[in-house]
């Protein structure tokens, strides 16, 4: 694989969150590098985002699928089967990507050839004190050991599914995500880490969820 030009597949499971999908897709139209496709998988939603996806088809290489509700792991596996990329990047629907996110991924893959990678999310300076406190409790090494994917680490690095990438051949060798509805990302990450495949933190800051923090933000990479 040519790491400089590897095609990336962004896999995004969605459940009843069309507004978040619109913000995420809008951030993807602003990427400085465009060697990616977007695979949206609607996980049995009653409030679908199909109309949102259709509005972006002239701006992005984006596909939409609707499947019966089976949980995020099942939706990610379905999306992976539809994908064409050399690498899969798994995102939550509430992410907002900084303009150089894809550029940063390409740079890290070219330099390291990592099998798996990931990065943190972070609160914006404009967040309220309560929103910042929630973010700190979920990302600080003092509270969780950096469980949500901080760049530095106290122990082994386990990318999390809100901002996680993996070589597609590695994903296939592992058999995909578990159908369990919670913790499937950590269970998925355990085998490659134990087998010493290269998994590394990548400095890729994301915007914060409207649903979780009450305000969507765009953050530059490296925060």
Predicted features and spans:
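Cell-envelope/extracellular polymer assembly enzymes that use nucleotide-activated donors
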Residues: 6-9, 37, 187
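Glycine-rich, basic loop-to-helix element that forms the pyrophosphate-binding segment
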Residues: 67-83, 104, 158-162
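Short aromatic/hydrophobic "clamp" motif used to bind/position activated sugar donors
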Residues: 88
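Catalytic donor/gating beta->alpha subdomain of glycosyltransferases that bind UDP-sugars
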Residues: 178-223
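N-proximal low-complexity "stem/linker" segments adjacent to membrane-targeting elements
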Residues: 1-30
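A recurrent flexible, glycine/aromatic-enriched loop bordering the glycosyltransferase active site
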Residues: 123, 144-165, 169, 180-182, ...
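Conserved donor NDP-sugar-binding/catalytic core segment of glycosyltransferases
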Residues: 100-132, 136, 195, 200-205
């Amino acid at each position: 694989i040519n790491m400089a030009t590897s095609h990336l597949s962004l896999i995004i499971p969605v459940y009843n969150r069309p507004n978040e999908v619109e913000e995420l897709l809008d951030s993807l139209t602003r990427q400085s590098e465009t060697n990616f496709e977007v695979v949206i998988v609607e996980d049995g939603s009653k409030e679908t985002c199909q109309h949102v996806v259709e509005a972006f088809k002239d701006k992005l290489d984006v596909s939409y699928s609707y499947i019966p509700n089976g949980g995020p792991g099942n939706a990610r596996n379905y999306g992976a089967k539809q994908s064409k990329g050399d690498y899969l990047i798994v995102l939550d629907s509430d992410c907002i990507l900084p303009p150089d996110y894809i550029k940063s991924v390409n740079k890290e893959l070219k330099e390291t050839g990592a099998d798996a990678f990931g990065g943190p999310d972070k609160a914006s300076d404009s967040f309220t004190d309560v929103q910042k406190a929630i973010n700190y409790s979920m990302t600080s090494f003092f509270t969780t050991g950096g469980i949500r994917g901080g760049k530095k680490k106290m122990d082994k690095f386990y990318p999390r599914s809100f901002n996680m990438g993996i070589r597609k051949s590695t994903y296939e060798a592992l058999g995909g995500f578990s159908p369990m509805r919670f913790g499937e990302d950590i269970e998925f990450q355990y085998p490659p880490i134990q087998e010493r495949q290269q998994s590394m933190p990548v400095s890729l800051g994301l915007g914060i969820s409207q649903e979780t923090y009450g305000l969507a933000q765009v953050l530059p990479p490296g925060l």
